[in-house]
Amino acid sequence: MASDIGELQLTDNGISGIPVFQVSRYAVAALDAGKGRVQAELDFMPEYGEKELIEYIDKIKADMCNAGKSCEMIKKGNMPSLADILTGLVNKKLMNLFIKLSGGQTESLAGIIKHFKVTVINSKGIISAQVCRGGVRLDEVDTATMESKLCHGLYFCGEVLDVDGCCGGYNLQWAWSSGCVAGAMSLGL
């Protein structure tokens, strides 16, 4: 099990974004190991607890009810252009959905927002990978020189080793740093 927090992208063929990159190695490993169904549970509003989210939805509902009443009152007055502006700020279908939510439905909506489940069926493969897992095990390498412990004179660097870091340039830095060490050591510098 793994978790991360950050911006999530819903795409035409799945989910993406930094949190997906961060936890995908575990999901792909579970898929590769045939561990059965792999699920991701998405929390679209992690800054709220479930109770606070229900209260927030109820507040939005009340605000939209009031906005709807205000728009109707303005429409009956002499300011149709202002009514059009206010009505355009709140999508009518969304406003009607929130207004019609009963208490139980509000709790169900909050539950879906906090615990949205997605079944992971595959990754996009090596072609689309940001980082690769696997490679030469570190216990087979002298990490001070990047030389193989099994084959003298063979040096490794970057993703050929079983090292992958979190997003943010760490994998690139690992490739550069380990490459500098391996290159210098292979030349006897």
Residue ranges and their predicted role:
Residues V23-Y26, T143-A144, S178, G188:
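N-terminal low-complexity, intrinsically disordered patches enriched in charged
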Residues V20, A110, K114, W176-A184:
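Predominant activation on well-ordered alpha-helical scaffold segments within soluble catalytic domains
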Residues S16-P19, V136-R137, V160, C167-N171:
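Gly/Ser/Thr-rich beta-alpha loop segments that engage phosphate groups in nucleotides
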